[in-house]
Each structure stands twice: as C-alpha cells, then as structure tokens.
A protein has these predicted regions:
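Conserved short-loop catalytic and cofactor-binding motifs
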Residues: 35, 131, 204-208
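A generic fold-level signal
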Residues: 39, 135-138
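Predominantly a Rossmann-like dinucleotide-binding segment in NAD(P)-dependent oxidoreductases
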Residues: 1-128, 255
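Eukaryote-specific, low-hydrophobicity, charge-rich regions
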Residues: 125-135, 149
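C-terminal helical cap and adjacent loop that interface with cofactors, partners, or active-site loops
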Residues: 137-267
Length: 267
C-alpha cells in the first residue's frame, strides 16, 4: 500500500537531556544549535526518505518548560555536590554519572572508574543544578510536516522519558507498521488481517547511534575507494532534512506559524 501519514517520537531520556541539553555542549542555541537540529535532523531525514516526497511546509510548537530556575527545589544549591536536596533529586549528578557511565567521558580524566568520575565531576559544569544552568534549548517540541502530495508526518521530541529510544507508527492504505528502534523488530498490522512481526538484523544495534556511526563511515570509505555505497545521498536531499529542522525552529519561535521549506529562492 501507500504511506498516508507517520507518527514518530524521539524520546531523549531524562538523563541524556540533563547531560547534553541542560548541563552539556548542546544546552545553548547560540553556542551550538537549536535542539531540533542537533537531535532530530536525522529523524527529519528518515521521514523524508520513508514518505519519498519533498517536505513543503512545517508547523512546530515547543518550549523550555521545566529546566528553569523557578522549578528548583526550595533549599537547593548551584552544585549537586553540596546540595541538601540531592538525595531526593532524580537529576543528582553523582547518581546519574555513576549509573550511566558513557556521559562521564566528557569530563573524566583517565579510566571511567567511579572514584575518577566523582573526583572530576565535583564543581564542574556537569555538577550544576539542572534548574540553574544557562540552557535555553527546548525540553519538548512537536512538529507537523506537510509533503508535496498531501502526506503528513508528526514528530515529537521530549526529554521526559525513562530511557533513550525512538518509536514510529506508519499508517498506510493497507496496513499499519509499528516499531521501536531499540527492539530490533517491526510489527505489521494489515487492515482487516492478522498482525505479524518482522525481525531486523541485530547488527544494526552495534556501536554508536545504533550502528549509524560505523555504517556512515563505511559508506564514505566505500565511496572514496570506488566501491558500491548504497547509503550515499545527493546533497540536495541531505540538506533538506536540515532545512526542515531550521524551519521547525523558526515556526516554534514564531508561535507555530507555517514555514515553507525551500532549498532555493523561488521554489
């Protein structure tokens, strides 16, 4: 059948949001980029690829609603290391960086052992209270995308999930397809028929970004050495996903106004 519309979600994970988009390198849109671009330009790329049409317009809504000074617990301090409320706070830096080890590589010198993590964390930017940082990027954003033949997609990005995962639901003329990227399978639900499962090669989940880092570099290496490189796209298609993200942010900042995606003037 034909795809009619898609619902997709980027569930950032509360601890990933705190590390990367509140305390860390992508917290401030002036110093880095809007979060929809930093986190979701590849989601835009996937939606564009699945629908197979140019995106013509975007409407987007979202804000920084929670990680703000007015939401800081009474009696809390600038740093988690000496905060009397730290034990009851889910964003306690000492708890997060000793439970989820990989983000500690941003500040830890030497081996990622607990004593090294706690030593280098104390009074560092990553020890800051999540309600008292200089962050300005959103903690949630929903975007509606219209494609040239009338197909639509809705994409939601949110900080408020327990884990990091993406999920998607594709509505077609003959079936629905539902999947969670980290589960390595899709469920196909034929309209009027019996649902069945399609397993996805588990190798795709190996390495950074669920294998994306490795396979992107492999395709570049293949292209440079004259080998087949099925994953390479033309620049105009690759740029379109970034334009979609920029348009989403422009729409959000203007209260959800319609933004038209144009690669060139006059389109």
């Amino acid at each position: 059948g034909e795809i009619v519309n898609i619902h997709a979600s980027e569930n950032v994970g509360y601890y990933h949001q705190a590390h990367s988009y509140v305390r860390g390198p992508w917290r401030n849109s002036v110093e880095s980029s809007p979060m929809i671009l930093a986190k979701c330009c590849h989601d835009m790329d996937i939606l564009r690829y699945l629908i197979g049409e140019k995106c013509v317009s975007v409407n987007s809504y979202g804000s920084l609603s929670y990680f703000r000074k007015e939401n800081a617990p009474e009696g809390s301090t600038q740093f988690c290391s000496d905060c009397p409320r730290s034990e009851e706070c889910i964003y306690n830096a000492q708890k997060l960086y000793t439970r989820y080890i990989w983000p500690a590589g941003y500040f830890t010198k030497g081996e990622l052992a607990e004593q090294n993590i706690l030593r280098d964390l104390k009074y560092s930017p990553y020890d800051r209270c999540v309600y008292r940082c200089d962050n300005d990027v959103v903690d949630h954003q929903s975007t509606v995308l219209l494609f040239e033949k009338g197909k639509t997609a809705v994409h939601t990005m949110t900080a408020f999930s327990g884990e990091i995962y993406r999920d998607i639901k594709i509505y077609g003329t003959k079936a629905e397809i539902v999947g969670v990227m980290e589960d390595n399978f899709l469920e196909v639900r034929p309209l009027g028929g019996k649902a069945y499962r399609v397993d996805v090669n588990s190798e795709a989940s190996v390495g950074g970004h669920c294998g994306g880092d490795y396979y992107m570099m492999l395709q570049i290496w293949n292209a440079m050495n004259g080998r087949p490189c099925e994953g390479i796209t033309y620049l105009d298609v690759s740029l379109e996903s970034h334009l979609m993200a920029f348009c989403a942010e422009k729409s959000r900042l203007s209260g959800g106004s319609t933004q038209f995606v144009r690669l060139r003037e006059g389109e």
